[in-house]
Amino acid sequence: MAPAVLANLNEPLFLGQCGAVFMRKYTNQPLSGDINNPLFNPNPNPNSISAYGNNSSKHFDDSSAYGDYVSFDLDGYTSNQLRELKKRLNSELEEVRFLRERIESGTFVSGSVYTTQARSFAGETNDVGVKKTKTKKKKIGHGQKRSNPFATDEPSLKRHVALDLMSEKVLKSMMTTCGQILVKLMKHKWSWVFLNPVDVVGLGLHDYHRIVDKPMDLGTVKMNLEKGLYRSPIDFASDVRLTFTNAMSYNPKGQDVYLMAEKLLSQFDVWFNPTLKRFEAQEVKVMGSSSRPGPEDNQRVWNQNNVAENARKGPEQISIAKKLDSVKPLLPTLPPPPVIEITRDPSPPPSPVQPPPPPSPPPQPVNQVEASLEVRETNKGRKGKLPKPKAKDPNKREMTMDEKGKLGVNLQELPPEKLGQLIQILRKRTRDLPQDGDEIELDIEALDNETLWELDRFVTNYRKMASKIKRQGFIQNVSTPPRNMPPVTEMGSAEKRGRKGGEAGEEDVDIGEDIPVEDYPSVEIERDGTAAAASGGSSSSGSFSSSGSSSSSDSESGSSSGSDSDADSVQSPFVEAKEAP
């Protein structure tokens, strides 16, 4: 199909005839009644005698012209026929323009055929002017097409056109975003180097074109974007990246231009990559909706899949059966294995070498068993806590805030008779203690790690000893303890096993080597007023501290978590003075 063209007028004939002849390229489908139409002349040769001669005869003087153009004698048409012809030619011209725009924009759908329906004009009959056929005036719109069996149906064509418009809209929005990114990039404080093309002559860069194959700058990218030379955002991004990669290729690493190009390239990727991902997602969405088959297509595909599956099942089953037949004779028939009856003795034979059974520990007293059970239950509840460091560890861990808080509360709960020992520990570790009269201010946060753990061991030993004594019911009044204290020794043994099981996780074994205290008389200490004021306790409390220190030293001898400093700090200095002579 080609647009109608105006043939050259022959001036001698034009003077004799008042009409004009318009020529149109001849199509494969002739107009209805054109061959028999007396006004139809397929030969535009003016030298022919019958160009405007007898209407009933047809002459083909120039046979080569037939099939190339169709001529219309405008003098023989009425006004209605001329209007119909004008509408027809305008419609074809609009269709050609529409197709041209689609081809240039790249949204042309291959496989769609755009043709013009053949319309018969009024008066194109054998009898001119005798009988005029009235045709209904039909409004001709853009894109009116001839029914073609090879063309796509009208609903699918409309869907393709709508999807093309959606894709074009998405592309336009993306290119607008690219322009905004380019403006932000050009406003960067380091982009002034890349705004204009490199002045090779002015800067004396004689080897620039040898290293850089395709020079590019942001100003050129902006100009190309405004002219619409980029068909996709990928082309735009490639030119922007080319600007910075050229600078990084020519300038050595570490120079200012290299660092500026590297920074701007990373910034461009940060701005552009999320936008590109959104654009690709929208494109996939549009393409997915365009490739979505209709119900008839689904039915057709389903039928084809079923036929293919049934056709595929047959050969597979046959081949599998053949393979099984070929494998069967290859398998030898093995005789059944003989049945072996095994009679088992009711008792298995003893092994020749048996390790000697471990010696059973002697039965523990009831009090010791209760103490070990209590320690085990306590250890079960402390699985989530951090283990306390041993006294002989050179590198002890830092005490946590919770442990410091508990230590402060336990120090405030100490009885007055234990304050003397507490002061001795503090004076041994800290030289200068802030003292206000009889009161000493103690800042736990200011103490070092060793002092904190030593105070913790001192408080823990006292609390364990006091709880065991109260639980067993051997002490009625702390100020007046009894003279014979065999339960104290028994408590010390139980405490030793409890601490050993709590920290080392070993089994509690009593080997019966504890020295009974009832064979020895209790120690009584007589102190004067000055010594009593220095120690801060009474004679009864001194007796208690002496016995407590003996049990504490006894427990420290069998425990891995104890320390020699505890035993020294717990024992009263007056006992040492008395034992010295």
From Swiss-Prot:
Regions of biased composition (Low complexity) lie at 530-564
Recorded hits in PROSITE patterns, A to Z, give: BROMODOMAIN_2, NET
Gene Ontology CC annotations of this record: nucleus
Q: Which InterPro entries does this one have? A: Bromodomain (IPR001487), Bromodomain-like_sf (IPR036427), GTE_bromo (IPR037377), NET_dom (IPR027353), NET_sf (IPR038336)
Query: Which stretches make up the NET domain?
Result: 389-470
| Bias type Acidic residues, positions | 504-517
Does the entry feature the keyword Lipid metabolism, yes or no?
no
Q: Where is the composition biased (Pro residues)?
A: 346-365
Q: Where is this region: Disordered?
A: 130-153, 329-399, 470-581
Write out the annotated subcellular location.
Nucleus
Instruction: Report the domain remarks.
Output: The NET domain could serve as an interface to localize different proteins or complexes to chromatin.
Q: What is this protein called?
A: Transcription factor GTE2
Source organism per entry reads Arabidopsis thaliana
